[in-house]
Regions:
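Internal "kinase-insert"/substrate-recognition segments embedded within catalytic cores
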Residues: 223-224, 234-243, 265-268, 283-434
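Short, well-structured beta-strand/strand-turn elements
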Residues: 261-276, 444
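Thrombospondin type-1
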Residues: 32-87, 128
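Middle-to-C-terminal accessory/interaction subdomains
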Residues: 170, 196, 204-206, 210, ...
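Serine/threonine-rich, repeat-prone extracellular segments and beta-strand-based repeat modules
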Residues: 49-70, 111-153
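Conserved NTP-binding catalytic cores of kinases and kinase-like/nucleotidyltransferase enzymes
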Residues: 91, 147, 153-253
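Solvent-exposed, low-complexity, repeat-rich "mucin-like" stalks and linkers
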Residues: 82-111
């Protein structure tokens, strides 16, 4: 994990154990005493400055503003000891295929609160390269960071090709792997594979019911695919079919947002790339190549149990998953069953009453253990841990007192006096806020149903001592590609509402006393970083640069402009081209931003 720093800047220093080491600090020359009494400084005006507790009591993890002072006569503002985290973003070389459009580089990640970016020499249209400059300025337009990177535009030969050979054996099962060899071409020579051995099977849940199947690849030895994740190697990779999403870029859009939010800390979001897939010599369409959701030193960095290790002090990857009972190891957290989730409205006599919050029932949820398990003790251990973290959260927002977990994962009285300090000592709240922000933007229909990941590591070398949320996944039914009333439209709050498959963790977060002020800060940083604009630019680039590949895909599958079970909205019937589907998505995202700008202004 990055070096951490506990900085006691007035009441902002709330033992934020998730704070990253700041790499640059900008302080004013004026000197103020760090208490709540009246301050004065002739450097701004002759009036008295009063410590603004409303501005400072709302904790912010992304960037510490320092203490804010406001003149109670003229309204002038003063920040003392502001510090900026310059580790949450990057400005790196980027290659584009020639598509006739201008291309620019942007800083990728979270630009510190209050900072702005100015670019120089940052536009290229024709084949060639150019070095661009990005300058980051603070609120006083003082330079705090300078980065350079190159734009490359190269000849457009379409998507990379992945060629899979199973010796003509069919790939039809989720349970049974089929031996294969895999080759890649139409890519940089250093990324070419020639008959790499391994296995392949189908994957997915609802997506398995479609004609175009998604796949999981498992190489015999660790292998990199097409340079993803900085060239890191792993055995397991996935090919997402994107059959239910006629834009075929919703997962790529969510991955862009997730990488911008998570991948400059020790959290994780999959890398990705659109590719053409050939199976036994036959074209099988456009897929998105992505990384398997797993414990790995270059993916989710938890210390998974070694083979036959039955100890409990290991790392655990957990998925909130309504189909968890289909997994080898799973457990439930919470009370009561929402029988409306089942066909026919339910059965049996489960009389257990669910917990309630603001009059809303928080029904029991199932969780699958996605890391290797070698004893029932391990399952019991992580179940007890997650159950008590959940109830510490619930009790805090329900008004039942503040609790933390002891060394035996039992609930005990919190040593802290605030909700934030208490919850942040057992949950990485920064990770929860970032996941909340991503799902709030995308309106993912399955946010409380499945493909929702969290992890914790009890080993001595753990990077995740607290419960951490991350590894966002599965967004084909999101961002307007859903026929339910709560997900189809681009307006209104989503994760804080008790609608559809709502997520109990997000619902509880939205009821904390620090949520409103803190989320506005995260949203402000997200907005200022122009992350959504980058995701929209990516969607448009894919549509233009790979136009011929998408045309070929729809010639193969002929599902454009048709309704795919189970959520496709009627507007999909109007799509005459792949570009139509992309235009609908980018307009929805733009409108979503306008709505959230008003809600969280």
């Amino acid at each position: 994990m990055k070096n951490q720093k506990l900085t006691f800047l007035f009441v902002l220093a709330l033992a934020l154990t998730g704070c990253n080491l700041v790499s640059s600090t900008i302080s004013s020359n004026a000197s103020f005493n760090n208490d709540s009494s009246t301050k004065s400084s002739s450097s701004i005006c002759e009036h008295d400055f009063v410590y603004d507790s409303d501005a400072n009591d709302a904790p912010t993890i992304i960037q510490s503003q320092g203490a804010k002072y406001v003149c109670n006569k003229c309204g002038a503002e003063k920040y003392e000891n502001a510090s900026y985290d310059l580790n949450e973003y990057e400005f790196v070389d980027q290659s584009y295929l020639y598509d006739g459009n201008e291309h620019q580089l942007t800083i990728r990640g979270m630009i510190p609160y209050g900072c702005t970016v100015e670019y120089e020499n940052n536009s290229l249209k024709e084949i060639g390269e150019k070095e661009a400059t990005a300058r980051v300025y603070d609120e006083k337009h003082q330079l705090v960071d300078l980065k350079k990177a190159k734009i490359h535009i190269i000849e457009n030969t379409g998507m990379p090709n992945i060629r899979i050979d199973t010796n003509n054996k069919p790939v039809e099962s989720k349970e049974t792997y089929v031996p294969m060899t895999l080759s890649t071409d139409n890519c940089n020579d250093k990324y070419k594979l020639n008959d790499a051995p391994g296995e392949i099977r189908c994957r997915g849940n609802g997506t398995m019911t479609y004609d175009k199947k998604p796949y999981r690849i498992k190489f015999t030895s660790k292998t990199n695919m097409l340079g993803l994740n900085h060239g890191s190697k792993a055995k397991s990779w996935v090919l997402l079919a994107e059959y239910a999403d006629q834009s075929m870029v919703r997962n790529a859009t969510a991955f862009y947002l997730g990488n911008s939010l998570f991948n400059y800390s020790d959290n994780y979001c999959s890398d990705y790339m659109p590719v053409n897939v050939y199976l036994n010599g036959k074209y099988n369409g456009v897929y998105v190549l992505a990384e398997q959701q797993q414990a790995n030193s270059n993916r989710i960095k938890i210390n998974e149990a070694e083979k036959n290790d039955t100890s409990t002090d290991v790392g655990y990857l957990i998925e909130l998953d309504s189909r968890a009972s289909e997994e080898d190891y799973y457990f439930s957290v919470g009370k009561g069953t929402d029988w409306s989730m089942f066909p026919g409205g339910g059965w049996g006599g489960n009389a257990e009453q669910p917990d309630k919050l603001d009059g809303v029932s928080l029904y029991r949820k199932d969780y699958a253990v996605k890391t290797d398990v070698y004893s029932q003790d391990q399952v019991n251990y992580i179940k007890k841990y997650l159950t008590n973290v959940y109830y510490a959260f619930y009790k805090a927002v329900h008004g039942d007192g503040l609790f933390v977990l002891d060394d035996n994962n039992e609930l005990v009285a919190s040593p802290y006096t605030t909700q934030f300090e208490t919850l942040n000592s057992i949950i990485d709240l920064e990770s929860v806020f970032k996941m909340y922000l991503l799902h709030e933007y995308m309106k993912d229909v399955d946010v409380g149903f499945g493909s929702f990941y969290m992890f914790v590591d009890f080993s001595t070398t753990s990077k995740y001592k607290r419960l951490t949320f991350g590894a966002p996944w599965d967004f084909d039914w999101s961002s307007g590609n859903v026929n339910t009333s709560e997900c189809y439209g681009s307006s209104g709050e989503y994760c804080s509402k008790s609608q559809g498959n709502f997520n109990p963790w997000f619902f509880m977060l939205s009821r904390t006393d620090f949520f409103k002020s803190m989320f506005k800060k995260y949203y402000s940083v997200f907005k200022n970083s122009q992350i959504l604009e980058g995701a929209i630019a990516q969607a448009n680039y894919f549509a233009a640069a790979f136009k011929n590949d998408y045309v070929k895909n729809y010639q193969k599958w002929d599902n454009l402009g048709k309704i795919t079970p189970k959520y496709t909205p009627d507007i999909a019937r109007t799509f005459k081209s792949h570009q139509d589907a992309v235009d609908y998505l980018t307009k929805w995202l733009t409108d979503r931003k306008k709505s959230l700008d008003q809600i969280f202004k």
